[in-house]
Structure formats: C-alpha cells, structure tokens
C-alpha cells in the first residue's frame, strides 16, 4: 500500500480517501514503488519524474495511471510539510518579535534613566560654574587689593614732595609713625616738660592694635593738600594711613621732612601724655602748620583726625596748642601764655587770644570754625568737657573757662574781661552739672550745628551761651563784673546750678540763630534755647544776671538763687521777642522751637532765667524774696517786655487770655506797670484751681482776682 492510515505527514485526515487512493495504485499494477521513492523529495523532483513517465510512450497506461495517483498523494504530503515548516518559521519570528519588544522596553527605561542623569549632571555643572565664577571674582578683588597695597609705598615720595614745601615755609612739623618699641621714647619725653628744646629729632607715633575689620579693608591712596579745612573722614571705615604728629619745641623750629607710614592701619587708641603741658598726640591723618612769633616755649601736638591746624602764637611767656582727634582746622594766635586744646571732632577753629598773663582755650568735638579774641589784663581759662561724661563741676575763685562742645558749629567770640571768666559745657549723656564758685563767669557754646559770633567786652566778666542746634548767634557783651553760664545738654539727668551773688549766667539752646549784644557795666545775660532760632539781643545791665537752662529729657531741674533775681521761662516751639529794660536785672531767654527773637535789655542789678524744656520729669524753681517767675508752657510764641527795678510784682490781670502768637516775626512790648504774670489761682470758697486769665471761678462762679503766685485771691 502506498499510504499508511496513521501517517499525519501524508496530508490526509480521512481513511476512506487513503483507502481509495491505495486501491487505484494497486489496481493498475504499478505498486507503491513511485510513492515510496519520492516521499521525502521536494515537489519539483516528484513532478519531474511524473512528467517523464507520462511522456514515455512505452510505459503502459495502467502504470501511468498508478504513478499519477502516487504523485497526487505526494503533492498533498509536500503541502503539509511546507505548512508545518511555515508555522515553525512563524513561531520563530514571533519569538524574535517578542524578544525585540522586550529589548526595546528595556532600552526605553534605560534611556529615561540616562535623561534624568543628564539633567542632574547639567544642574551640577551650572552650580560648579557659578561657584567658579564667584571664586574668580573674589580672587580678582583680592588680587586688586594686593596690588593696591603693593603700590601704596610708591605714593610716599609724592606726598613728601607735596607736603614738604608748606611745612618748611610755616615752620610746621609732620611725622611718620615709629615702630612699637619706640613708644617708650615718646613717654620719656614727658620728663623734659619744663625744658626748652630746639628742633626735635625724635618723631612721636603710637600705633594702636590692628582691628580685624581694619586689616580686611584696603586703605585708599592719600591725597595730601595744604588747605586748612578738609572734609571729615568717616570713622566707621579704615581711614588713610595716618601722617602722625611730631612734637616741635622752640621759638623757631625747623620743618621735619614728611615720611609716609607703612601699609598698616592704626585705629585710634588711648595715648600717653607727652610734653610739659600734658597733651596727647593721637594719630589720624593730619597736617599741622605752626607759626610762632616772639614766643619762648611752644609745643604743638596734633592728634587723630584728618585735620589741618594752623597756630600762631604771639606772646612773651608760653603758648601751647593741641587739637585732639577730629577733622579740624585751627588758627590760633596766642599772646604770652595761652593754652589751646581742640579735642575730638571734625572742626575748624580760628582763635585769637590776647591777654597779659595766661588764657587757656580748648575746642572740643564738632565741625566748627571759631574765632575767639580775648582781651583782658588777667587770666582766662577755657576748658572743655567731652562726650559721655557723667558730671562736670568747675570750682575756683579766679579761673575763667570757655567751652565749645560737640556739633558742627562755627563760633566767633571776642571776650574782653579783666577778672575771671569760666566756661563749662557738659555734653551729651551727662548725668549732672553743678558749677560753684563766688566769682566765676562762664561762657559755653555746646552741642549742635551752630554758628555763633560772640563779642564780649568789659572789664570783668561778660557771658554768652549758645547751645544745641544749627545756631548762628552774634553777641556783644560789655559788663564789668562776673558772668556765669551753665548748660546741661540733651539726656541729662539733673541740672542744679547753685550760684552766689553777682554771677550772671545765660544758656541758649537748640538749633538757633541768635544775634546778641550785651552792654552794661556789670552783668548782662542772654539765653537762646533749642530750636531753629534767630534772635537779636542787646543787653545793657550794670550788675548781675544769671540764667540756667536744663535741656530736653532732663529728669529734674532745680535752680536755687539768691535774692533780687527775676526769672522767666518760656517753653516749647516758640518765637519770642522780649525787651527787658530796668535798672537792676535784665534777662532774655528764648526756648525750644523755630524761634526768631529780638531782645533789648537794659537793667542794672540782677536777673535770673531758668528754662526747663520739653520732656522734663519735674521742674521746681526755688526762689528767694523779690524773685518773680513766669513759666509759659506748650507750643507757644511769647512776646514780653519787662522793665523793673530791684523787685517787681505781678500786676492785676484782666479777664483776657494772654496773647499767644503762632506766627513768627511779631513783637509785643509792655510797660513796666503792665507786665503780666500767668499764674493759676485758687478759689477761696470752693478751693478750685483757675487759670490766671479768669476773673471768676469756673466752678462756683464767684468773682475773685489773684494778686500773687501762691494761689491767694483778693
């Protein structure tokens, strides 16, 4: 048989078909030889063999028929085999596709991971670039500073050439800092206090400890110039390397050549006393020029600060001049034995003092220009108490003092007095100020951006005081006896002046511009308090005037005064114009505010003025007999005129409120018989307190008029 029934490779699924084909093959007589011979051959070979048998004419028809049925069965078998091969190939392709798809998924996830890593790397790269740029910038800045520091010593010859000429012409002295081990030489020079030295060769310099902030900052190149008033240098930043001072003694000292210091920065520090006048010579980029004519012993020490000071001394005995740390320019011609000291601050001081024995002057903090002329036969002493002092107490029978404290002030003072003048100013944050002494006039120009021009002429002791603020004051005082002025400035706890007889005192405060002329044989007084004031005062009084002003934020103010001293206290932002004329006690006080006051005072004996300003806790004036007191409070502009003999009493007040003028520039004058005293009075029936301008009690409606300040009625 040609085909087997169980052979699935034959391509036939039905046995009947297989049986029929086998019978046909066997019936023709050819047998299964052709089917078996081409079972495993491809279809092409089967077809070629069948074509050869059919084409052969010698092969009987029955054999041709049997070979044809065998070829048909082989064709089905070949088709089945090819199908199986195709299925196998399809399965294999499917497996390959699945494998490729899995590979693509893996590559996709890997690609996403690579993208994330790329973004992180890019961010890190940007950060690294920013840090690198910052480091490069810092490197460039530090390199620039290093180059500046390296180039800085090259500027020393240029500065020397610029400064050597003016110093040689003016017999001045400027020096470079010495090493630390040479400080002992400077301190040792104090032993030669009373000896006259010609041109000194030792140069004084005391370097302070280097601050870390000063080391970090780069110093700018110095630009030296010989002008006397340079702009102030900021204290919060490291300044130019200082050109430290040198002590020059002798009537005609030769100029010391200028030398530039090393590249260190020397901040301000405490300095030892040098010389026979106990003067300190700190550092602060300064230039000093001193001209001395007809003087025996002169010592000039110029301290810290971008200051330029010019001092001329004329006299026969001893002159001394020392400006302390600050940006100051000072011109001081002295005669005989004056002593001048200009402490801390950016100030320009022009002082001329002429006397016969021994005046002393010292100009403290502030950018100010001051011209002071003192003419008198005896001794004048000027002393300055600097910032943050707790208390200041000046005592002495014959020691005039002059004080010009902190502030951007320009004051011009001429003082001509014969006995004693004492000037004292206790500056900011002072707890207490108490001047005592029988015959001590004072002259005080304290804190503030003030410009005051003062002329004091008289045989004994005039006084003129202009306190805090942008003040411009012009004062002429001519009085023969004694004047005392005391000013306790801002944030002072208490101010208690205790004064004996014949001590006039006046204290102007605030941002004021005052013009004062005081003329009289004994003791005029003029006070202009805080505020943007412009006051013009002329005072002619023969004997004594006393004025005391305790400024803003003071806890208490208690003046204690002798007899026959009138007192007047206007408070607030006021514009007052007061003329006081009388034979005994003139006084003129203009307190805080934008004041413009014009005062003329002519009185002969004693006047006392007390002003307790805004924000004071308590004000308790205690006065002896024959001392009237007036205290107008608030934001007021008061205008008053008083003319009185030794004592005066408040007049009967009308049922009218005192005129309060809120416009500047107006004036009010009253006769001596009609001077009002605004004092509250107490009703004798209902004990209610009424204002001074009321004629009837507001509570019980009963008419009564006060006659004195103690609250009694008539």
UniProtKB/Swiss-Prot annotation:
> Domain of life of the organism in this record?
Eukaryota
Show the ranges annotated as biased composition (Polar residues).
403-416
Query: Basic residues bias: where?
Result: 379-392
**Region Disordered, residue ranges:** 300-419, 431-675
Entry's Pfam families?
A: TEX13, TX13_rpt, Zn_ribbon_TEX13
Tell me which UniProt keywords the record has, alphabetically.
Metal-binding, Zinc, Zinc-finger
Show the stretches that span the lipid bilayer. none
> Per the record, where are the segments of Basic and acidic residues compositional bias?
307-320, 366-378, 495-505, 557-567, 636-646
Q: Extract one GO molecular function annotation from the record.
A: mRNA binding
Cite the residue ranges of zinc fingers (RanBP2-type).
677-706
Q: Which family does it belong to?
A: Belongs to the TEX13 family.
Name listed for the protein in its UniProt record: Testis-expressed protein 13D
UniProt source species: Homo sapiens
């Amino acid at each position: 048989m040609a085909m087997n029934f169980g052979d699935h490779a034959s391509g036939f699924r039905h046995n009947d078909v297989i049986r029929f084909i086998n019978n046909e093959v066997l019936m023709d007589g050819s047998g299964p030889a052709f089917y078996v011979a081409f079972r495993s051959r491809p279809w092409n070979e089967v077809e070629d063999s069948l074509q050869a048998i059919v084409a052969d004419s010698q092969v009987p028809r029955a054999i041709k028929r049997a070979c044809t049925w065998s070829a048909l069965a082989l064709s089905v078998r070949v088709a089945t085999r090819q199908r199986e091969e195709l299925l196998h190939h399809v399965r294999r392709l499917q497996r390959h596709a699945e494998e490729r798809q899995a590979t693509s998924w893996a590559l996709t996830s890997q690609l996403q991971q690579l993208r994330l890593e790329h973004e992180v790397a890019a961010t890190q790269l940007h950060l690294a670039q920013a840090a690198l740029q910052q480091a490069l910038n810092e490197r460039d800045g530090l390199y620039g500073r290093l180059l500046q520091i390296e180039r800085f010593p090259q500027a020393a010859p240029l500065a020397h050439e610029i400064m050597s000429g003016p110093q040689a012409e003016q017999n001045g002295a400027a020096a470079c800092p010495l090493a630390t081990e040479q400080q002992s030489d400077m301190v040792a020079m104090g032993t030669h206090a009373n000896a006259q030295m010609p041109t000194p060769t030792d140069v004084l310099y005391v370097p302070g400890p280097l601050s870390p902030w000063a080391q970090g900052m780069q110093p700018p190149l110095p630009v030296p110039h010989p002008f006397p008033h340079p702009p102030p240098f900021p204290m919060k930043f490291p300044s130019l390397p200082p050109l430290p001072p040198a002590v020059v003694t002798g009537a005609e000292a030769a100029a010391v050549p200028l030398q530039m210091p090393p590249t260190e920065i020397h901040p301000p520090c405490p300095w030892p006393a040098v010389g026979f006048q106990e003067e300190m010579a700190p550092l602060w980029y300064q230039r000093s020029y001193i001209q001395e004519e007809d003087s025996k012993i002169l010592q000039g020490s110029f301290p810290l600060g971008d200051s330029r000071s010019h001092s001329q001394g004329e006299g026969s005995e001893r002159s001394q001049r020392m400006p302390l740390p600050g940006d100051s320019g000072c011109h001081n011609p002295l005669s005989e034995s004056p002593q001048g000291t200009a402490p801390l601050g950016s100030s320009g001081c022009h002082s001329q003092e002429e006397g016969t024995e021994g005046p002393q002057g010292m100009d403290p903090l502030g950018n100010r220009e001051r011209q002071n002329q003192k003419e008198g036969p005896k001794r004048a002493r000027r002393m300055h108490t600097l910032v943050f002092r707790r208390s200041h107490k000046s005592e002495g029978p014959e020691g005039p003092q002059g004080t010009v404290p902190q502030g951007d002030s320009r004051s011009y003072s001429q003082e001509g007095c014969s006995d004693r003048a004492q000037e004292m100013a206790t500056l900011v944050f002072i707890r207490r100020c108490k001047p005592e002494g029988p015959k001590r006039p004072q002259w005080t120009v304290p804190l503030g951006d003030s410009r005051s021009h003062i002329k004091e002429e008289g045989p004994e002791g005039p006084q003129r005081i202009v306190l805090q603020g942008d003040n411009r004051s012009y004062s002429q005082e001519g009085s023969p006896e004694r004047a005392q002025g005391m000013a306790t400035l801002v944030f002072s706890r208490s101010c208690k002046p205790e004064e004996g007889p014949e001590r006039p005192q006046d204290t102007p405060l605030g941002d004021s511009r005052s013009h004062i002329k005081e003329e009289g044989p004994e003791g005029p007084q003029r006070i202009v308090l805080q505020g943007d004031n412009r006051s013009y005062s002329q005072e002619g009084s023969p004997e004594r005037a006393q004025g005391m002003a305790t400024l803003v934020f003071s806890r208490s103010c208690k003046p204690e005064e002798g007899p026959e001293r009138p007192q007047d206290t206007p408070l607030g932002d006021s514009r007052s114009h007061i003329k006081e004329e009388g034979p005994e006690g003139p006084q003129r006080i203009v307190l805080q505010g934008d004041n413009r006051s014009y005062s003329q005072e002519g009185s002969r004996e004693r006047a006392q003025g007390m002003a307790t300003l805004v924000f004071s806790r308590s004000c308790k004036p205690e006065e002896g007999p024959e001392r009237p007191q007036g205290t107008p409070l608030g934001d007021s502009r008061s205008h008053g005129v008083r003319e009185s003999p030794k004592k005066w009493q408040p007049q009967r007040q009308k049922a009218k409120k005192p005129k309060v003028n809120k416009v500047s520039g107006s004036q009010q004058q009253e006769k001596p018989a009609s001077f009002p005293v605004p004092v509250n009075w107490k009703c004798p029936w209902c004990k209610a307190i009424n204002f001074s301008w009321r004629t009837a009690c507001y509570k019980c409606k009963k008419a009564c008029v006060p006659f004195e300040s103690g609250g009694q009625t008539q």
